[in-house]
Curated annotation (Swiss-Prot):
Organism: Xenopus laevis
Solcar repeat extents: 192-277, 285-370, 382-470
Family as reported in the entry's similarity comment: Belongs to the mitochondrial carrier (TC 2.A.29) family.
Protein name: Mitochondrial adenyl nucleotide antiporter SLC25A24-A
InterPro entries for the chain: EF-hand-dom_pair (IPR011992), EF_Hand_1_Ca_BS (IPR018247), EF_hand_dom (IPR002048), GDC-like (IPR002167), Mit_carrier (IPR002067), Mitochondrial_sb/sol_carrier (IPR018108), Mt_carrier_dom_sf (IPR023395)
GO CC aspect terms: membrane; mitochondrial inner membrane; mitochondrion
An individual GO BP term: ATP transport
Domain EF-hand: 19-54, 55-88, 86-121, 122-157
Length: 473
């Protein structure tokens, strides 16, 4: 069916007037399943799906809303034809703006240059994948007919929106804050779309962290106390409930949620500054430079909010009634240990950024490119499940590499609050853990940490998508 539709749409490429009307009429006839002379959202969804035409989420609703001039919830043939005529005009403008050398075809270099002007740098291989998703004759170039038919039912009407159709950014919050920040185009920065994405991501992170807080607190307890009294996940959760009731499972979560906003803002600002510093004269920012800029941005953000990390750990390992809240905890730490206590464990925390961010980025790019090279037959869009899968696997591998440093950081943050515990530095703690608990002692608490990855990713994605709709992204 798709092949027939493509042949039909690609035929008579230069046709205007009545020929265009005939083309629209035949397409309308295919979509009007119940033959009532109108096409509604459901018929659009089913018809486009049957034709194999991939459109963005909610595209059918946007098409009907844009073309439905009499607001009856349907498109009659006149409305359908006018919508496609207007949409094709906008698509022609977008095509012309991409076709820099005016040869009537879009090439890989033109895709790369256009994305570059919007603040996105991609490889030649990625540009070719984008073209292949539209190229029906195998020439690795896209002419007007191929361009028009690919975006025929995509409601994007300018080059910036089409670029966003190609650009995929997924916000995943698994409770760790060492990932490299998202990229935003210059257009997104100018129009204010960036802060909406950050807000949506922040809300997703807050809900995700709250939903998985019991497992996060159990991880901290196991990191600090070893497996004593917490030999497995169920036993550990029961011990926490027995000590402080069900509410104690969320102890320390408030700080964990509150720190999302300042950390995200600082990381975004710092990343933009470091990118300017590392961008070459040609304006290109390679993968290595992006990794360095992202790692430095993460270190800057962590430095600014690190006292809140210490508060989170102290509240999580604290006993019932020990602290009345975040400010009481901060006050008691200051009085007893001084201001430097708020930066205990800072060095292993910063050192953990390099393996986490590096492995996370490297594995994500490897998995994404593997999919593009082996499975991207009809589209350069991997889809939600593939992107979520790549993000989950890469983040998990990053955690695995940096976990020993995270464990040492947590113990250094908490050791002053444990009576009789020696105040060891990073090296001393490492030797003590290996000598007493063996090599695998460096991975104490990793089971609940891994257990919360899947629900955390799922919750953050669902909330992020809902927030995008609410914010009109």
């Amino acid at each position: 069916m798709l092949e027939q539709v493509q042949k039909f749409l690609l035929s008579r490429a230069a046709c205007e007037g009545s020929d265009s009307h005939t083309r629209y009429a035949e397409l309308f006839h295919k979509l009007d399943v119940n033959k009532d002379g109108k096409v509604d959202i459901l018929e659009l969804q089913e018809g486009l799906k049957a034709m194999g035409m991939a459109v963005g989420k909610g595209a059918e609703e946007k098409i009907v809303e844009a073309g439905d001039t009499n607001k009856d919830g349907h498109l009659d043939f006149g409305e359908f034809m006018r919508y496609l005529e207007e949409h094709e005009k906008k698509m022609k403008i977008a095509f012309t703006s991409l076709d820099k050398n005016k040869d009537g075809k879009i090439e890989s270099s033109e895709v790369m240059n256009s994305l570059k002007t919007l603040g996105i740098n991609i490889s030649l291989d990625h540009a070719e994948k984008i073209l292949k998703s539209m190229d029906s004759d195998g020439t690795l170039t896209v002419d007007w007919n191929e361009w028009r038919d690919h975006f025929l039912f995509n409601p994007a009407d300018n080059i910036q929106q089409i670029i966003r159709f190609w650009k995929h950014s997924t916000v995943l919050d698994i409770g760790d804050s060492l990932t490299i920040p998202d990229e935003f185009t210059e257009e997104e920065k100018k129009t204010g779309q960036w802060w909406k994405h950050l807000l949506a991501g922040g809300m997703a992170g807050a809900v995700s962290r709250t939903g998985t807080a019991p497992l996060d607190r159990l991880k901290v307890m196991m990191q600090v106390h070893g497996t004593k009294g917490n030999s497995n996940i169920i036993t550990g959760l029961k011990q926490m409930v027995k000590e402080g009731g069900v509410r104690s499972l969320w102890r320390g979560n408030g700080v964990n949620v509150i720190k999302i906003a300042p950390e995200t803002a600082m990381k975004f600002w710092a990343y933009e500054q470091y990118k300017k510093l590392f961008t070459s004269e040609s304006g290109k920012l390679g993968t290595a430079e992006r990794f360095i800029a992202g790692s430095l941005a993460g270190a800057t953000a962590q430095t600014s909010i690190y006292p809140m990390e210490v508060l989170k750990t102290r509240l999580a390992v604290g006993k019932t009634g020990q602290y009345s809240g975040m400010f009481d905890c901060a006050k008691k730490i200051m009085q007893k240990e001084g201001i430097l206590a708020f930066y205990k464990g800072y060095i292993p925390n910063i050192l953990g950024i390099i393996p986490y961010a590096g492995i996370d980025l490297a594995i994500y790019e490897t998995l994404k490119n593997y999919w593009l090279q082996n499975y991207a037959k009809d589209s350069a869009n991997p889809g939600v499940l593939v992107l979520l899968g790549c993000g989950t696997v890469s983040s998990t591998c990053g955690q695995l590499a940096s976990y020993p440093l995270a464990l040492i950081r947590t113990r250094m943050q908490a050791q002053a609050s444990i009576e009789g515990a020696p105040q060891l530095n990073m090296g001393g703690l490492f030797r003590k853990i290996v000598a007493k608990e063996g090599f695998f002692g460096l991975y104490t608490g990793i089971a609940p940490n891994f257990l919360k990855v899947l629900p955390a990713v799922s919750i953050s994605y669902v909330v992020y998508e809902k927030m995008k709709i609410q914010l009109g992204i």
